Amino acid sequence: MAREEGEQQESMAEWLIDVLGEPSAVRNPLVHEPRRTRELSDLLLSYEYGCFLLESKTLGIFDRIDIPDRSALRKGVLRHVNKAANQLAGACANIRRGLRITDKAGQDITVNRDWPIHCIILVPELSLIADCDELIPKLALSLLGNSKAFLNLVDLSELHNLVYNAGSIASKSQKLTRLMAFDGILLKRCELASHHKTPDFRFRMTVADDK
């Protein structure tokens, strides 16, 4: 059941990211390290102005005999978020090292390695960690300083809102694609998150119509 829970959340994330248009996201890409080949991230999307890495974390509550209380769920989410941040830091390092990256069939994936990387951690529900006011600034500063990457912590509802926001911005622009708008939205959201008192916030960006 936990595997199904994780697969479902990853599939929803992949579907939402693919709404942004071409190129499509790659599910469970592989990085070929000198000693072994392993998964780079849950999702990878690269385009001409950068790339996005997404790690999806679930709680596996359907495998448990007793439903945990919110305090236990909070601890579980925090543990998974820290694990995801470490995984993303490693993925960023492998991208910067120029290691070969492929899909599961062994086909090479062209990855933009020159621009800062957008790292997304997808959790089941942001409200579970609403009181963790130091979480995002700490993790975001670490990723930015060590990996030249921007971090956004979202749940499916917020990811849906951000994708919809990107489509709305792109529809009012002659120059911006949905992917470009999504890139800009994540950048501004990451900047705002470092000044926010809680990871549980909703973000929407507006721009002037240039048509």
Residue ranges, per PLM feature:
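Intrinsically disordered, low-complexity Ser/Thr/Pro/Gly-rich regulatory segments
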Residues: M1-L40, L45-K211
